[in-house]
From Swiss-Prot:
Pathway(s) served: Xenobiotic degradation; 2-(2,4-dichlorophenoxy)propanoate degradation
Organism (species): Sphingobium herbicidovorans (strain ATCC 700291 / DSM 11019 / CCUG 56400 / KCTC 2939 / LMG 18315 / NBRC 16415 / MH)
Binding sites annotated in the UniProt record for 2-oxoglutarate: T129, W242, R268
Single biological process term from Gene Ontology: catabolic process
Cofactors named for this entry: Fe cation; L-ascorbate
Protein name in the entry: (S)-phenoxypropionate/alpha-ketoglutarate-dioxygenase
Effect caused by changing R207A: The dioxygenase activity with S-2,4-MCPP and (RS)-2,4-MCPP is 17 and 8% of the wild-type, respectively. 15 and 10-fold decrease of the affinity binding for S-2,4-MCPP and (RS)-2,4-MCPP, respectively
Effect of N98G: The dioxygenase activity with S-2,4-MCPP and (RS)-2,4-MCPP is strongly reduced. Loss of the dioxygenase activity
Catalyzed reaction equations: (S)-2-(4-chloro-2-methylphenoxy)propanoate + 2-oxoglutarate + O2 = 2-methyl-4-chlorophenol + pyruvate + succinate + CO2; (S)-(2,4-dichlorophenoxy)propanoate + 2-oxoglutarate + O2 = 2,4-dichlorophenol + pyruvate + succinate + CO2
Effect of R207V: The dioxygenase activity with S-2,4-MCPP and (RS)-2,4-MCPP is strongly reduced
SUPFAM superfamilies for this protein: Clavaminate synthase-like
Enzyme class per UniProt: oxidoreductase
Length: 287
């Protein structure tokens, strides 16, 4: 039986736009069809949803427990005033850091499963969210490089990735603390991940990854940058141009994502609900 909604694949190795469905009214049969599509496409885009906070949280919960229910990713302060780049406060540091390709919570003991992200207010230009298919990236590696990365691991740290931008994080950093700053031992993760539900292999890289055991620091950095540069190229990438009311659901176990710049004199208000990873498959090798 075909699903009760329409699926239009993106012009990329992954992703689809889903129409003919209201996520707030999704029944159990529809959710099962949607989950199957998510595992196939890894990224689902839902235009014109206009979810309330409660509806977004409820939809995200259908995929499992949440790492956190809702976080505002925005250059607008709670009092309505605009953050400016020169403020360089915790949230501005997060916004700038998120412009590097990354997967969520790889620097935590348990990596996130996925996320629901929605747009409330968007700028007139810029502010897209990019996604990159690490399944297709792994498949496209030459056999020698594929064999090499199969044997390697890397450390993942938000302290490391933010320090590369000149941001010195602290355990007590206000908005970092809610974002999942991990102050324990640095997690170690394989460069090649096997998806726990589909069995497909993908690269596990991104801006938090560093310090491959057995390699000199410079060689480790070169290899990780080489992999990102190769992986995050067409047809393995898609950048979503947001409209108010859009929602997306992505699989954090096989995609990277990034924010893109915009004129920060314009408001951008986004809402992020993060789906917790299953400890059986998403726990770091060491942490």
């Amino acid at each position: 039986m075909s699903p009760a909604f329409d699926i239009a694949p993106l012009d990329a190795t992954f992703g689809a736009v889903v129409t003919g469905v209201k996520l707030a009214d999704l029944d159990d049969a529809g959710w099962l069809d949607l989950q199957a599509a998510w595992l196939e496409y890894a990224l689902l885009v839902f235009p014109d949803q206009h979810l309330t906070r409660e509806q977004q949280i409820a939809f995200a919960r259908r995929f499992g427990p949440l790492e956190f229910e809702m976080a505002a990713i925005s250059n607008v302060r709670p009092d309505g005033s605009l953050r400016v780049e020169s403020d360089n406060d915790d949230m501005m540091k997060i916004l700038k850091g998120n412009m590097g390709w990354h997967a969520d919570s790889t620097y935590m003991p348990v990596q996130a499963k996925g996320a629901v992200f929605s747009a409330e207010v968007v700028p007139s230009v810029g502010g897209q969210t990019g996604f990159a298919d690490m399944r297709a990236a792994y498949d496209a590696l030459d056999e020698d490089l594929k064999a090499r990365v199969e044997t390697l691991q890397a450390r993942h740290s938000l302290h490391y990735s933010q320090s590369k931008l000149g941001h010195q994080t602290k355990a007590a950093d206000g908005e970092y603390s809610g974002y999942g700053l991990h102050d324990g031992p640095v997690p170690l993760r394989p460069l090649v991940k096997i998806h726990p539900e589909t069995g497909r292999k993908s690269l596990l890289i991104g801006r938090h990854a560093h310090a491959i055991p057995g390699l000199e620091p410079a060689e480790s950095e070169r290899l990780l940058q080489q992999l990102i540069d190769f992986a995050c190229q067409p047809p393995r990438i898609y950048h979503h141009d947001w409209a108010p009311g859009d929602a997306v659901l992505w699989d954090n176990r096989c995609l990277l994502h990034q924010a893109t710049p915009w004129d920060m004199t314009q408001k951008r208000i986004m809402w992020h609900s993060r789906i917790a990873g299953d400890p059986a498959s998403e726990t770091a090798l060491a942490h």
